[in-house]
Curated annotation (Swiss-Prot):
The actin-binding domain 1 (ABD1) is intrinsically disordered, and binds to F-actin with higher affinity than ABD2. Induction: Up-regulated within 1 hour in the left ventricle following the application of pressure overload by aortic banding. Keywords: Actin-binding, Activator, Cytoplasm, Cytoskeleton, Phosphoprotein, Protein transport, Transcription, Transcription regulation, Translocation, Transport. This is Actin-binding Rho-activating protein. Acts as an activator of serum response factor (SRF)-dependent transcription possibly by inducing nuclear translocation of MKL1 or MKL2 and through a mechanism requiring Rho-actin signaling. The gene is Abra. Residues 37-101, 175-197 are annotated as: Disordered. Residues 193-293 are annotated as: Actin-binding 1. The modification Phosphoserine is found at S150, S182. It is found in: Cytoplasm, Myofibril, Sarcomere; Cytoplasm, Cytoskeleton. Gene3D superfamilies: Costar domain (1.10.10.1540). The keyword Hydrolase does not apply. Residues 294-375 are annotated as: Actin-binding 2.
């Protein structure tokens, strides 16, 4: 038989063999999935209907070690029907190729952790009350008590401290208007006739002088000051005042805005700046326009410094120490960095950093113009 005829006959046989192998692999995979589904459904059916804390806990299953990799079996040879039925029962008991692994839960939510902290504290207070403080390990208790996990508690404490501080400052600044009802000023012994009184009167006056005001009056006065400070430094009043201030500023700005319906021509003309006034020709301080102008000035100044650095690195030095370069050479070098060569040169000359002849520079026409770096 010729070699060509052998190859032609082997081609269809090889393709048929590959088809049979693929079909067998798909059948085995489907059988494995079906077996896994049956086992999973059986295990779920055996589990309890509801969850009880600590009542039903499955024992940890040891993961099965995967066996050696099994290759796809060769296409079976035709056998009688009885053999097929026996083989089907044996294949049903084969171990599935799907790997399973038990996953244990290791992450506990924050709510459970806080509940555990509370239980731990109550247990320590109930059972370890008689133990001395030196023996108790206070690290865990201090960590729980001194922790600032709650932002609400932290915010309330901060507000309370600030209000109390402001109230006491106001109370220190204001002079007390109440008097001690223990003794009047006229009868306190202060005056010129102090020396003429007998020693008994002096002793009585000294004893009366060290008396303190009644607690009821002092408490009433401190409560009054605290109420005044609370009303004066209340958060609601502060928020209301800020909103009112913003509303007044907005109304005033709308009166000066020519594009607003509330524009007041007379007010705008009376408040406008004239030439020579401070702030004339500049944006209003604190506005967005002023911020953009500041950023633009910083950007232009940075580009001017870069231009001076390029001139300093590529130019030749004169005898007097100054650096010179022609406009054509600078244009060919700096145009790769920025296309604003002429504008930056004009700006640098305005600031006194460079000098060149003429009001404007043109490429090709003014390539011979000498640019001198002054600083």
């Amino acid at each position: 038989m010729a070699p060509g005829e052998t190859e032609r006959e082997a081609g269809p046989a090889k393709s048929a063999l590959q088809k049979v192998r693929r079909a067998t692999l798909v059948i085995n995979l489907a059988r494995g999935w079906q077996q896994w589904a049956n086992e999973n459904s059986t295990r779920q059916a055996q589990e309890p209907a509801g969850w009880l804390p600590g009542a039903t806990q499955d024992l940890p299953h040891t993961p099965k070690e995967p066996g050696p990799r099994q290759h796809a079996p060769k296409p079976p040879s035709p056998k009688p029907d009885g053999d097929r039925e026996g083989r089907g029962s044996e294949e049903a008991t084969e171990v599935s190729h799907i790997k399973r692994k038990e996953v244990t839960r290791t992450v506990v939510s924050k709510a459970y952790e806080r509940g555990g902290d509370v239980n731990y504290l109550s247990h320590r207070y109930e059972h370890d009350g008689g133990v001395s403080e030196a023996v108790q390990p206070d690290n865990d208790i201090d960590r729980i008590l001194l922790s600032h996990d709650s932002p609400t508690r932290r915010r309330k404490c901060t507000n309370l401290v600030s209000e109390l501080t402001k109230g006491w400052k106001v109370m220190e600044q204001e002079e007390p208007k109440w008097k001690s009802d223990s003794i009047d000023t006229e009868d306190s012994g202060y005056g010129g006739d102090m020396e003429e009184r007998p020693e008994q009167d002096v002793a009585q006056v000294a004893a009366a002088r060290i008396k303190r005001p009644l607690h009821s009056q002092a408490n009433r006065y401190s409560e009054t000051l605290n109420c005044k400070a609370h009303r004066k430094y209340s958060q609601v009043d502060n928020l209301k005042g800020r909103w009112q201030q913003w509303a007044d500023e907005h109304i005033q700005s709308q009166k000066l805005n020519p594009f607003s319906d509330e524009f007041d021509y007379d007010l705008a003309m009376s408040t406008r700046l004239h030439k020579g006034d401070e702030g004339y020709g500049r944006p209003k301080e604190g506005s967005k326009t002023a911020e953009r102008a500041k950023r633009a000035e910083e950007h232009i100044y940075r580009e001017i410094m870069e231009l001076c650095f390029v001139i300093r690195t590529m130019a030749r030095h004169r005898r007097d120490g100054k650096i010179q370069v022609t406009f054509g050479e600078l244009f060919d070098r700096y145009v790769r960095i920025s296309d604003k060569v002429v504008g930056i040169l004009m700006r640098a000359r305005k600031h006194g950093l460079v000098h060149f002849e003429g009001e404007m520079l043109w490429q090709g026409k003014d390539d011979h113009v000498v640019i001198t770096l002054l600083e």
